[in-house]
Amino acid sequence: MEALVYTFLLVSTLGIIFFAIFFREPPKVPTKKLK
C-alpha cells in the first residue's frame, strides 16, 4: 500500500508542477488539439 501512496503523491506533484508551468508560460509548440 505504501508504494501506491508514494507513487500517487509523486504523480500528483509532477502533474501540478507541469500544469503550473504550462499555464504560466505560453505553449511554444502549436497545440491545435487542445483548443
Curated annotation (Swiss-Prot):
It is found in: Plastid, Chloroplast thylakoid membrane. One of its GO terms (biological process) is photosynthesis. Keywords: Chloroplast, Membrane, Photosynthesis, Photosystem II, Plastid, Thylakoid, Transmembrane, Transmembrane helix. One of its GO terms (cellular component) is chloroplast thylakoid membrane. The keyword Plastid applies. The chain crosses the membrane at residues 3-23. PSII is composed of 1 copy each of membrane proteins PsbA, PsbB, PsbC, PsbD, PsbE, PsbF, PsbH, PsbI, PsbJ, PsbK, PsbL, PsbM, PsbT, PsbY, PsbZ, Psb30/Ycf12, at least 3 peripheral proteins of the oxygen-evolving complex and a large number of cofactors. It forms dimeric complexes. This is Photosystem II reaction center protein T.
